[in-house]
A protein has these predicted regions:
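C-terminal regulatory/oligomerization modules of transcriptional regulators
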Residues: 1, 121-146
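N-terminal leader segment of winged-helix/HTH proteins
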Residues: 1-29
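Short, locally clustered residues in the helix-turn-helix/winged-helix DNA-binding domain
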Residues: 12-15, 40-44, 105
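Charged, amphipathic alpha-helical coiled-coil/dimerization segments
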Residues: 19, 69-129
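Pre-recognition alpha-helix immediately N-terminal to the DNA-recognition helix
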Residues: 37-40, 99
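Short capping segments at the starts of secondary-structure elements
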Residues: 45-49
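Residues within helix-turn-helix
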Residues: 50-51, 62, 69, 89
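The alpha-helix within a helix-turn-helix
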Residues: 54
Length: 146
């Protein structure tokens, strides 16, 4: 295995461990990771369009449509027609969705602190700097490749 393959495996394993922890946490609230992050993006950007949500979540519009239908059916999300352009929908959390997001978000923040608290401040800062650089490079490569 080359050094780059090993590095990729480390990054992937880190993602899988983080994702597994998140899935386990969110399942206690009846949420998948996707459902939580949809709620989280809408909570942070009330009036967000489904198209923008699909960009933020790196998934296609048909997946977002299914995800939103489920969140609407559960009473967490509502859609409103844009005031000036009836072709555009805007997404908002309902009171029930706001309560759920607030509760899960608070628990998730504590969970993040516990997990990242395993690193020293120096290691945490170094990892943040390295990941910022890596994410910028990936985003640039993505935009160059279409």
């Amino acid at each position: 295995m080359t050094g780059r393959e090993h590095l990729y495996d480390l990054i992937k394993e880190s993602f899988l461990l983080l994702d597994f922890g998140d899935r386990t946490l969110f399942e206690r609230y009846g949420l998948s990771v996707s459902r939580y992050y949809a709620l989280h993006h809408i909570a942070g950007n009330p009036g967000l369009s489904p198209s923008r949500l699909s960009q933020l979540m790196f998934c296609d519009k048909s997946n977002i449509t299914r995800l939103l239908q489920g969140l609407e059916a559960d009473g967490y999300v509502t859609r409103h027609v844009h005031e000036r352009d009836a072709r555009i929908q805007r997404l908002f959390l309902t009171d029930k969705g706001l309560r759920l997001h607030r509760e899960v978000w608070t628990v998730h923040l504590t969970f993040i602190e516990q997990r990242l608290g395993l690193l020293s401040s120096e290691d945490s800062q170094q990892l943040e700097t390295t990941l910022d650089c890596f994410i910028r490079a990936l985003a640039e490569a993505r935009s160059l490749n279409g």
